[in-house]
């Protein structure tokens, strides 16, 4: 088999096999030449940007990764959550496991799948999912009352629609009404959803509210700052100026 050297911010190599794979710590990348790194060099350059734009979507992913405790099981939603966590994650705490799932239509059934993966884990279980993915699976929490699991944390990143489509170049030139339809824009709150299933609820713009949560299932609604998000991605797309 082909030998692979993997430089990662976590212990996960991203490969299905362990043979002929050397996994090196993320810090190794600092000793390499930027000219050979491409996007990875840009990731290092944007660590300060993630901190500066802490209320942006990628900034929130970085903050969430910092407060999720060791030994947790984390389920990442499709579309932007998994991409932004992959970008923003600096390191993982001991024993943190990551899961993801691709529904038949992409984002369907994610809350249900999260609850299924949580059933066998007695530590904290975190779902980080987009608003449209949540709307596709509103009935999922019916099973929570039968699970006897006090540490379920459902984080809904509510950016008012499918914002991944706003980053598709071919769609940017469309008329505004067409873009609104494609993005499925809305102004919904997920508090009534939490109330319907008897779950605790908090909407926050301060990650410190998520430290030492009560041992009860809870819906956490986060509304990222759209201007910070747009500025972050605009800076991200700027070319990396490499030293000669």
Annotate each predicted stretch with a short phrase.
Residues 27, 31-33, 69-72, 83-88, ...:
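Redox- and metal-dependent alpha/beta enzyme cores, enriched for Fe-S-associated oxidoreductases
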Residues 10-17, 83-85, 162-165, 229:
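Short, charged/polar "capping" segments at the starts of alpha-helices
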Residues 39-122:
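Active-site diphosphate/adenylate-binding microenvironment
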Residues 3-5, 73-75, 126, 153-154:
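A structural signal for isolated positions on well-ordered beta-strands in alpha/beta enzyme cores
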Residues 1, 65-70, 147, 212-215:
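Flexible, charged surface loops at secondary-structure boundaries
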Residues 1, 6-10, 53-54, 76-80, ...:
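Structural motif
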Residues 1-43, 144, 169:
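Glycine-rich, acidic loop regions that bind phosphate or pyrophosphate groups
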Residues 89-244:
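Thiamine diphosphate
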